[in-house]
Regions:
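Short, small/polar-rich motifs associated with maturation and membrane association
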Residues: 1-365, 369-371, 376-380, 451, ...
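Conserved C-terminal beta-signal and adjacent last beta-strands/turns
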Residues: 10, 331, 369, 762, ...
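Membrane-spanning beta-strand positions in outer-membrane beta-barrel proteins
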Residues: 72, 117, 150, 250-254, ...
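Glycine-rich phosphate/pyrophosphate-binding loops
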Residues: 148, 158, 342, 854-874
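Active-site phosphate-binding and catalytic loops of NTP-dependent enzymes
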Residues: 150-154, 228, 625-632, 945-948
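Surface-exposed loop/interface segments of Gram-negative outer-membrane beta-barrel transport/assembly proteins
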Residues: 176-177, 182, 193, 248-312, ...
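Residues on the lipid-exposed face of transmembrane beta-strands in outer-membrane beta-barrel proteins
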Residues: 243, 330-334, 364-370, 452-458, ...
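Short glycine/threonine-rich loop-to-helix capping motif typified by GTGT followed
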Residues: 608-612
């Protein structure tokens, strides 16, 4: 018996030895190559088996029984590139971030969807793109990076913003701006109505209150499948902003320091010097008044201008400077146990190119979330305080703007100061006097923005969850404007005028959703969401003014020192929105996808007959590369076809547009009286946009990625503020008058040219072609203004004016087409016919660029471009082409017609312009084509073996240039071919170029 037992034990040990010889224990750690931090939750799988593990809190893993025959581990993690590595006993694996994988998740505001199952059209911009830009507004980072995005901003003044189109202008007269959603909450941008816009004609930019350093990603939602869930506010697209949250892993501190300067980008407005200007003025004065040329020259030089005949004064140079730029950001990010946190602090101070214009912003953000076994509780919050100094940028001009005064009220013969050192030409709007820090003009805006978004989510198990979110957005603005006693507005003897504008916008949103995610039979996935939302918007506004500032000469320009009231104004407004919505997604075998959404909105903005509107979408997608005939294809690695159709709405008009109002204060015979100020319209209803999109996504070799979209968007019941007859006593009223259509193509390519451990080289490009057309107009006549016309069958931004042909080389007179056919010409401006002479919107726009990394060196070069649009420069007609005695452009001074120079480029300059050479015509309509070097960045990251000794995880130094240069059409006259929405520019704030150097530190 004893011998049998010994034999049994011997066999057992031999068996164990054989098994041990056939398996092995593999341990290791997975870290991020980007910051050296552990990658928690990464999947580690033995290739070809079911043996695997998930990395722990230190990025560690253990595989106790790996077959000895196994050679490879497959390691994967969302946001990282999947790697296959050879098996060793103790392993350390560095995972690289996958920018392509970042696109695999689409944030829709109400939730997150896998891009593979997403049937809509969307584009994602990550934090790396934002980090390269210096603009206070994060939206500028989308220009050239996202197809379908058109920026309309003709100024580089800090803190001033224009507008943005997503797939063209979608409305005639109501809001054209996309809906902004920040961390799931709609935010009131309202750059069209009820905005933070005052008589300075500058739109104070509410989005510049959000620090780009706090943003994780921006998702642009375009078609109906992506936007219909937002119903009545989604006609112009949706921009979803996701801020940074607590990250897995240990505590990180990130510091980013940027400093630099702001200078002129490029200049297409070269003004003549004093000698050139005097010759042109004398030519023009002699042509108008007659007499001897030299005697006229002497009169103008000595008596009219008092010129010393040798000095030449550059007024644009006098009001310009090299502005200082500084941007500091500190954030702390991590997760302790079940609690994640992100704390961000930022300070931005940027001086504008023109003296007296600047922006200063303090910002803070706190995002917290705590995860329980069955629930998540969190809050996203931010605060910012912004101070902006500037002046009017109206296309109508304002002599109280130093920029306007410099180019339209001064000449190079006018000195800056008189013989006693005081400001010269004080009665002719000396811009230096306007900018005097002690006694000059003031235009300061202070904006406070508070966002508070607490949320609570319960997970019931089996894919069922419920979430409630409260959003509070408060935007408060105080703006003070002081008009110097030297330059009283409206020619009134005010002895100084101070105007205080205060407003407060509050938006409270509460939404509740319940969702269900379910998978059955291994091939069927379904997700369902039902939701309800309520929103209340309130707007408070007050204005008061005073004059008579007795101590203004000593620098006391505060309203409390003024003596005479000049009026006041006060009002409050409210608007409410109630909504119910549903969203469903289904997929089969991860190849066929269907989606649908429905939303019912009720808005207080519209008439009692049309308070409620229904909006919906359907979408489908086929992943062709998942079929058997392509599954083994190593060249075509992804091919998908998608399509969507649906309706969305637009309610961005004056909140009380459908109601009739009366104003008091109109007394008669000492009896109190009132008069109607608006006409009620109970039939006023939503604009409804029907959106169709078909798209194709294609990838080759997992390196070349192509996306193509065709879209057709038609807006009906377009809202427009119609002028009324003077006999009504009311100037305008809103009506639904027509339809507008945008049809276009989007194309993008992203390719990895070289990809290995040391060298990575990528290239991207995108292109958008869009055609805008007014397809229906219910008014009796087209709607015409000074420069443009809204007419059925033409683009919304159609220029309509007398068409300039050239000059009569025998007489020097300007010529225009006499008739609409364009087969006859005339030198009589009044006899010339108006013609369609171009469209303000570009036909094609987009961007392209490349980025390269080699070991620790990184290099980025980005461009954006426009082709086909027109720009009208009304300021050039008033100034640069010699109207009256205003400084001409150098080219005009040297190349205007004279009897001795009959082959000249420009018509004869004649004082007071009797030939209407500077009247409105296509003479001042220029090509808006341009190619801009939007960003160049060069950086170097020190090796971790150096920095870790100082407890620094990452140290990167870099230099960057924004808007390095803009190549324009040869005939363009202006500082910037990028215009406001109507394509008209005048007295532009010069385009700026920002040079910065920076350091990024991660501890």
């Amino acid at each position: 018996m004893k011998r049998k037992l010994m034999l049994l034990l011997a066999c057992l040990f031999v068996g164990i030895g054989l098994v041990t010889a056939q398996t092995q224990k593999v341990t290791g750690v997975v870290i991020s190559e980007e910051d050296g931090q552990p990658v928690i939750g990464a999947s580690v799988l033995v290739k070809g088996t079911q043996i695997g593990a998930i990395t722990g809190v230190d990025g560690d893993f253990t595989l106790p029984n790996v077959p000895s025959s196994a050679k490879t581990l497959v390691i994967s993690y969302i946001g990282m590139k999947t790697q296959e590595v050879s098996i060793r006993a103790n392993m350390k694996v560095s995972m690289k971030p996958d920018t392509e994988v970042l696109d695999e998740v689409v944030v829709t505001g109400y939730g997150v969807q896998r891009k593979a199952s997403f049937t809509g059209a969307a584009a994602v911009v990550g934090k790396d793109v934002l980090a390269k830009k210096t603009d206070a507004n994060f939206v500028k980072a989308l220009e050239g990076a996202v197809p379908g995005i058109q920026m309309n901003n003709s100024t580089s003044m800090p803190g001033i913003w224009g507008s943005i189109y997503v797939r063209g202008r979608g409305s005639l007269n109501s809001g054209t701006q996309p809906l902004y959603v920040i961390d799931g909450m709609p935010v009131d941008s309202d750059t069209d109505d009820n905005s933070l816009t005052y008589p300075t004609n500058n739109t104070i930019d509410p989005m510049s209150s959000l620090n780009p350093a706090d943003i994780e990603s921006i998702t642009v939602l375009k078609d109906a499948a992506a936007t219909a869930i937002y119903g009545s506010r989604a006609a112009n697209g949706v921009i979803v902003v996701t801020t940074k949250k607590g990250a897995e892993g240990k505590f990180n501190i990130n510091l980013d320091i940027k400093q630099g300067f702001v200078t002129t980008a490029n200049n297409n407005m070269d003004f003549a010097n004093a000698q050139q200007t005097m010759k042109l003025f004398t030519d023009g004065y002699t042509a108008a008044q007659g007499g001897d040329w030299q005697e006229n020259y002497n009169y103008l030089a000595d008596d009219y201008f008092g010129w010393d005949r040798k000095s030449s004064y550059d007024w644009m140079d006098a009001i310009s400077r090299k502005g200082y730029y500084q941007d500091y950001n500190l954030n702390m990010q991590g997760r302790t146990g079940s609690t994640g946190y992100y704390v961000g602090l930022g300070y931005l101070n940027t001086e504008g190119l023109i003296i007296g214009s600047d922006l200063e912003r303090f910002s803070g953000r706190l995002n917290l979330d705590t995860k329980f076994k069955w629930a998540t509780l969190g809050v996203n919050s931010s605060y910012s305080y912004t101070t902006q100094n500037g002046f009017s940028l109206s296309t109508a001009g304002s002599m109280n703007s130093p920029l306007t005064a410099a180019v339209s009220s001064q000449t190079p013969m006018n000195p800056f100061y008189d013989s006693e050192g005081n400001y010269a030409n004080i009665n002719n709007y000396n811009p230096l006097a306007l900018m005097d820090e002690k006694t000059g003009e003031l235009n300061q805006s202070n904006t406070q923005m508070v966002n508070l978004n607490p949320y609570f989510q319960i997970d019931f198990g089996k894919g069922i969850y419920a979430k409630t979110t409260l959003g509070v957005n408060i935007n408060e603005l105080r703006q003070y404007q002081y008009w110097s006693a030297l330059y009283n507005p409206q020619a009134q003897d005010y002895n100084g005028l101070g105007q205080q504008y205060n407003s407060k916008s509050t938006v409270v949103t509460w939404n509740n959703i319940i969702g269900w995610n379910y998978k059955f039979a291994d091939k069927h996935d379904i997700s369902l969401m039902l939701g309800q939302e309520m929103q209340k918007k309130s707007y408070f506004y007050e204005y008061y003014a005073k004059s008579d500032f007795p101590f203004a000469a000593s620098g006391m320009r505060d309203l409390t020192t003024a003596g005479t009231d000049q009026g006041n104004e006060y009002y409050k407004q409210e608007a409410r929105l109630a909504s119910y919505f549903a969203d469903v997604h289904y997929s089969y075998a991860d190849k066929y996808y269907l989606s649908g959404s429905f939303r019912r909105d009720g808005s207080s903005v519209f008439g009692t007959d049309n308070r409620w509107g229904n909006f919906w979408s359907v979408g489908g997608k086929w992943r062709i590369s998942g079929e058997e005939f392509l599954s083994e294809n190593e060249i075509i690695t992804n091919a998908t076809l998608r399509a969507s159709y649906g309706t969305v709405g637009n309610q961005d008009i004056s909140w009380y547009a459908a109601r009739g109002f009366y104003s008091s204060g109109y007394n008669y015979n000492q009896m109190p009286g009132m008069r109607p100020t608006s006409i009620p319209n109970p039939e006023l209803t939503w604009e409804v946009s029907k959106k169709f999109d078909i798209g194709f996504d294609l990838s080759f070799l997992q390196r070349i990625h192509l996306t193509f979209d065709f879209y057709n968007e038609e807006t009906s019941d377009a809202l427009f503020e119609i002028p009324l007859s003077m006999t009504t006593g009311i100037s305008k009223t809103y009506q639904n008058i027509g339809s507008i259509r945008n049809r276009g193509i989007e194309f993008s390519i992203n390719t990895s040219i070289i990809q290995n451990n040391d060298l990575n080289w990528n290239f991207f490009a995108n292109l958008t072609w869009n055609k805008n057309e007014v397809i229906k107009l219910s008014t009796d006549d087209p709607l015409e203004d000074t420069y443009q016309i809204i007419e059925q069958g033409h683009p919304y931004s159609q220029f309509y004016m007398k068409e300039y042909v050239g000059i009569d080389h025998e007489t020097g007179k300007p010529l225009w087409y006499l008739n609409k056919e364009g087969d006859e010409t005339t030198s009589d401006y009044n006899a010339a016919a108006k013609r369609y002479v171009g469209d303000a919107d570009p036909k094609v726009l987009g961007g392209f660029g490349t980025n390269l990394t080699w070991k620790g060196v990184d290099f980025n070069l980005n461009f954006n471009y426009r082709l086909g649009g027109k720009v009208y420069n009304s300021g050039a007609a008033f100034t640069g082409f010699g109207m009256a005695f205003r400084t001409p452009l150098e080219d005009v001074a040297l190349n205007s017609w004279t009897p001795e120079n009959k082959n000249a480029k420009y018509p004869q300059y004649i004082y007071r312009d009797p030939n209407n050479a500077t009247a409105t015509s296509s003479r001042y309509l220029y090509s808006g084509n341009y190619l801009r070097i939007s960003n160049v960045t060069l950086g170097y990251t020190l090796p971790k073996t150096w920095t870790q000794k100082a407890f620094i995880q990452k140290l990167r130094a870099y230099v960057s240039v924004d808007n390095l240069y803009t190549f324009t059409a040869s005939d363009f006259v202006g500082y910037n071919p990028e215009t406001s929405a109507d394509g008209v520019i005048a007295w532009q704030y010069p385009a700026t170029c920002t040079f910065i150097g920076g350091i990024q530190l991660t501890f």
